[in-house]
From Swiss-Prot:
It comes from Dictyostelium discoideum (Social amoeba). Coiled coil: none annotated. It is found in: Mitochondrion matrix. Residues 105-124 have a biased composition (Low complexity). One of its GO terms (biological process) is proline catabolic process to glutamate. Disulfide bonds: none annotated. Signal peptide: none annotated. Residues 105-140 are annotated as: Disordered. Keywords: FAD, Flavoprotein, Mitochondrion, Oxidoreductase, Proline metabolism, Transit peptide. This is Proline dehydrogenase 1, mitochondrial. The lineage of its organism: Eukaryota, Amoebozoa, Evosea, Eumycetozoa, Dictyostelia.
Amino acid sequence: MIKNTVRIINKNSNTFINIRNNNNNNINSSLKSGFGTIKRFNTTLNHNSSNSNIQTPISINSTIINNNNNSNNNNSNNIINNDLNVVKFSTISTPNSILDTLNENHSNQTNNVNNKNYNNNNNNFEKDDKFGPPNNQNNNKLDLDTSKLYVSKSTGELFFTFMILKVCSINFISDNSQKFLNLFEKLGLSKPLNFFIKYSFFKQFCAGETIRETEIFTEKLNKLGIGTILDYAIEELAGSSEGFDSVAENICETIRVAAKNPTNSFSCVKFTGLVTPSVLEKMNTLVSNVTTNVSELPIESFNSPLDFYLNQSSSLMKQGSEPLLTSKDIKEIKEFFNRMDKIFQLCHQRGVPILVDAEQSYYQVAIHHLTMSYSIKYNKEKPIIYNTYQMYLVNGMNVLKQHFELSSSQKFNFKLGAKIVRGAYMVTESERSQRLSTENPVLPTIQDTHKSYNTALDFLLNQIKSDPNSIGLMIASHNEDSINLGTKLIKQYKIDPTNPNIQFGQLFGMADFLSFNLVDQHQRIFKYVPFGPVEEVLPYLIRRMHENKGFIGSNSDKELFYLKKEIKRRLF
């Protein structure tokens, strides 16, 4: 089947939409421009689309008809609007498979727009790369009943959410958020600033300052059919041993709370919250000196990972090299292992799965090695420990396959826990590679990242199709296309959607319209529920603001659209 596609650019807002027409000459649609404003246009196509042999893009010249309707009526293509231009007309063959549909969807976006979006929206790779509000350009897109979607929220809550997400989309504020914090601290105004943040951004993206405060939200989410991922949201601490011990104890407390409802709860851990980042980087260097492919490491490195790192450091000294690890580093590494032992052993005892967060690539080989070591120990019967795979990395798919082969090998034979994400450190990764004149570990375009993510999703669901208990999968994404792909593949592969080893994950305070749609489809959906003292969670909030800047300009436009729609429905 041939589809005619017209791409429309709104010159005022720099957004575009694709209008698709299945051999129908009349197309009506709308393009959002500002709060509550819909600009309508009518496009009449006289292009002969009956020739099914046409497979390539066709350029056309279009006449823009101004408000006075002065036009050349003999022109074969008339666009009635004063601020819209047709920039592309093409005929597209309908793809044969779901995965082809998703990859074509992404690759058909304008490269210049997407590359700019990919480079500027620094920390957001859980977003869709489409612009504008929901429209009917793709039958897979959502068109939700907002009265049902937001039935649990008051009008005040809806307006509050809209305002916070809108502020996060302002580049000047999000780009300079850390500078504002530093300025207020220099002026001695940290306390009033923290008070303001607590009742604004913190309230939107965090569930409280203590684990007990989060229980109100977890109960509310559970009643709505949504599970929780309890997250002590400390980005990193370069502090004392006591500080790291405190973080470990808070994580253990999340496990104890989650154990009250283990089938509907996760915990999570970020290793730079348990050890000084520079020490973790040294550990990464030690394991990378052997190999960057964790599956190639000797069995002893998994059975006794602490001894492995200490022995690697000793080997360097014997070779006449300067010791990579100081006596202080060795002491800290031993304490780090004690904290990990405590956390993962408690998860295993209580039956609570835990997600190990991904971090920058210069920590990641060590993180992979440590996570696989504990997975081998505790994931024999079911996935308890989940590793995170960043699909925006060049080696993302290779690493995922290597770890799956490791888990299914006879010498280890454990259940792989896999959380797949796009990634969140593009700017720091790119800046570091430029500074060190090394190869950028991040894929060059957003289209490559979309393809990598969707390929990983298909690969993992294929394994679950063959053996429902082989893998634990967390599909962590706010990308509507990837979510649609996941639900379609689950149906196509005839996988039970209630399988406890498959779940979708999204962030608290974001993408509620996607979360509730998954509930309606009887999929298992979990929300990250962060908590912690306001002043310690500020780095997390800044990262959320950066991610929302990109998310607002794309998939979150849809969330704003639904929020506005419901507010207007209630008020007018």
